[in-house]
Amino acid sequence: MKKLLSLVIIVVGIIADQVFKNWVVANIQLGDTKKIWPDVLSLTYIKNDGAAWSSFSGQQWFFLVLTPIVLIVALWFLWKKMGQNWYFAGLTLIIAGALGNFIDRVRQGFVVDMFQTEFMDFPIFNIADILLSVGFVVLFIAILTDKETK
């Protein structure tokens, strides 16, 4: 049952990410901004050929090699730790986010980013980035609370 739940979460995460990215591309000009919540959140369409803070900009080969490795390792750990809820949640979200951005990189050579925080200076990000970030936080909690690793 957990395998099916993991698959559903991954598929829903990827679909949400891809549908929203396509909506942004169709409705916002590259570089333009639409205010969503004044002084809090805007949608700004950018093409990101790197990672957060534009690190590794222009290094698509790096992501095209690294992402499948991360996915294989995450899937292996997910299989091994399926019964542990924190690992299950974290790894499932990481896989969904990694696949969401990987699809963009393979299809377009860049990732579509759109969420811009207005209240602090932070890189523009997308749904896949949210899934990855939350997944890594949850995985970190899993590792810290895992009795086997202590």
Curated annotation (Swiss-Prot):
Could you list this entry's UniProt keywords, alphabetically sorted. Aspartyl protease, Cell membrane, Hydrolase, Membrane, Protease, Transmembrane, Transmembrane helix
Gene Ontology terms describing biological process: proteolysis
Q: Which reaction does it catalyse?
A: Release of signal peptides from bacterial membrane prolipoproteins. Hydrolyzes -Xaa-Yaa-Zaa-|-(S,diacylglyceryl)Cys-, in which Xaa is hydrophobic (preferably Leu), and Yaa (Ala or Ser) and Zaa (Gly or Ala) have small, neutral side chains
Q: Where in the cell is it found?
A: Cell membrane
Got any disulfides in this one, which pairs? none
The answer to whether the entry has keyword Hydrolase is: yes
Name a GO molecular-function annotation: aspartic-type endopeptidase activity
Q: Which biological pathway?
A: Protein modification; lipoprotein biosynthesis (signal peptide cleavage)
Q: Which domain of life is it from?
A: Bacteria
Role, per record: This protein specifically catalyzes the removal of signal peptides from prolipoproteins.
Q: What's the protein name?
A: Lipoprotein signal peptidase
